[in-house]
Amino acid sequence: MLVECRGFLNVKKQMTDLHLLHESIVDETEIDSLGHMNVRYYMFRVARANVELMKRSGVFVRKNPNQLIRRVDTYSRFRTEQFAGAKLNTLGGFIATEQTDRIDGATAYFEIRNPDSGDVAASFVITSDFVDVSTQEPIDASTTIDSDSKYLVEIPDYGRPRSLSLAKPDVGTLEEIEPVISDEQVPGMMSGRHENVVYTEDCDDRGRLREEIDLMFVLHRRNPDEEDVSFGPPEFRDLQGRRYSWAVMETRSVVFARPEAGNKIVSLGADTAYGEKWRQSRRWMFVKDTGQLLGISDTVGICIDLDARKAIPIPEATREAIERNYLPQFA
């Protein structure tokens, strides 16, 4: 019996081992302000692996230049820090969609492993779809993965979400979200309001933001005069003088559309839940002038002592700011 996916992948439930799809070594330039490989470079590796999986399996066969493959839903779980010089292998395979409650499309599971330590550095559940470049609409281009396909795998228990839901998110509009976002900037986790412009050099030959560029990195890019400043989460100090910041543990990003060169993008973010040492946030990204929803991003992070490299309770001033501004109705 086939498991149906609207989009381009149908699969039968017979699972095999994960397949090696990408190999790399962590470069010094990929190390951020927390002293470890930044989230964006995990995403770079898994995006390459996703394309490689499509090619090897024969799922991604471009029929005309007006169609492309897009990651429309990306769940990430980060497990162990990786440092400069570490060798990393990215492995994965397709999964039956009945294992998840995600949006339609072809869903795959990936892991980034350190073969020297044996650690699983991060795991991912990704849904991709064929998209018409001109209309930005999904294309119905069904393909079947046979029951004996070596590319069909199962999500291990440790790769499943811990805190975030993979259900279809409630979207909301710019008119609904903007009035409830406070002007107060709660330290860390990209809360509050942020704006930036899509540069021409960020775009493909059609003038649309390239598929491999994450909207969050457009919104929070460094200015040219900040090239020598370490990138990554900002550093803070508590009343005891400890250096602390926020380490991302889980993320989920859903893409609805890609902006064009010159578009002004606005990100509206707030905490939706928190505990003694952690917080969960949601960010909505819109084209400012039209109100078009581009994407929704959820993040779970823990407060860490940067010197002791361990989780600590959220400092009181930050906790109070979270309490004043959080939006539990969006959790």
Question: How would you name each of these model-derived features?
Answer:
Residues S24-V26, I31, M37, Y42-V46, ...:
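Long, contiguous hydrophobic alpha-helical segments, chiefly transmembrane helices and signal peptides
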